[in-house]
Amino acid sequence: MQVLVRDNNVDQALRVLKKKMQREGIFREMKQRKAYEKPSVRKAREKAEAVRRARKQARKTAIREGLIAAPKPKARPVSPRRPAAPAPASSPVGAA
């Protein structure tokens, strides 16, 4: 996998690399290969993943054809703005 580093901005290049690796599924595969997985467990996992993919595809098709209503987008919480910095308290000159 190759990433361009522009203007010596290594942080941005690392972010791009991580995003590419995430998209390719490398992190998931590394996690799976960390320990041995029995063939029977692997087969069961792959079957469950296939069922999940088929359900997702069927749901998307049904939404596209209008058979079921599309889910409402989640309302994003509005974060309160920071209050303006209070003006420094000015003390009266004569008060002590």
From Swiss-Prot:
GO terms for cellular component: ribonucleoprotein complex; ribosome. Residues 69-96 have a biased composition (Low complexity). Pfam families: Ribosomal_S21. The keyword Ribosomal protein applies. One of its GO terms (molecular function) is structural constituent of ribosome. One of its GO terms (biological process) is translation. Residues 52-96 are annotated as: Disordered. Keywords: Ribonucleoprotein, Ribosomal protein. Signal peptide: none annotated. Belongs to the bacterial ribosomal protein bS21 family. This is Small ribosomal subunit protein bS21. The lineage of its organism: Bacteria, Pseudomonadati, Pseudomonadota, Alphaproteobacteria, Hyphomicrobiales. The gene is rpsU.
